[in-house]
Swiss-Prot record:
Protein source organism: Oryza sativa subsp. japonica
Gene name of the record: LTI6B
Keyword Transmembrane helix recorded: yes
Induction trigger: Early induction by low temperature and abscisic acid (ABA). Late induction by drought and salt stresses.
PROSITE patterns named among the record's database cross-references: UPF0057
Cellular compartments annotated: Membrane
Annotated InterPro entries: PMP3
Protein's name in the database: Hydrophobic protein LTI6B
Signal peptide: none
Tissues expressing this chain: Expressed in shoot and root of cold stressed seedlings.
Functional note: Plays a role in the regulation of membrane potential. Could mediate a proton leak.
Keyword entries, A-Z: Membrane, Transmembrane, Transmembrane helix
Family: Belongs to the UPF0057 (PMP3) family.
One Gene Ontology cellular component annotation held by this UniProt entry: membrane
Amino acid sequence: MAGTANCIDILIAIILPPLGVFLKFGCGHEFWICLLLTFLGYIPGIIYAIYAITK
């Protein structure tokens, strides 16, 4: 199942978007973008996290 997101990854991304991205990518630029978007608004953080995890 390499390259695909499972249900747990998506669920974590919905509950805590930066955590879901961190678990997938570590502390890279994806994490910081997601953290910033989550601070600016929870919904943009969720959308970006799901996008980043599933791409």
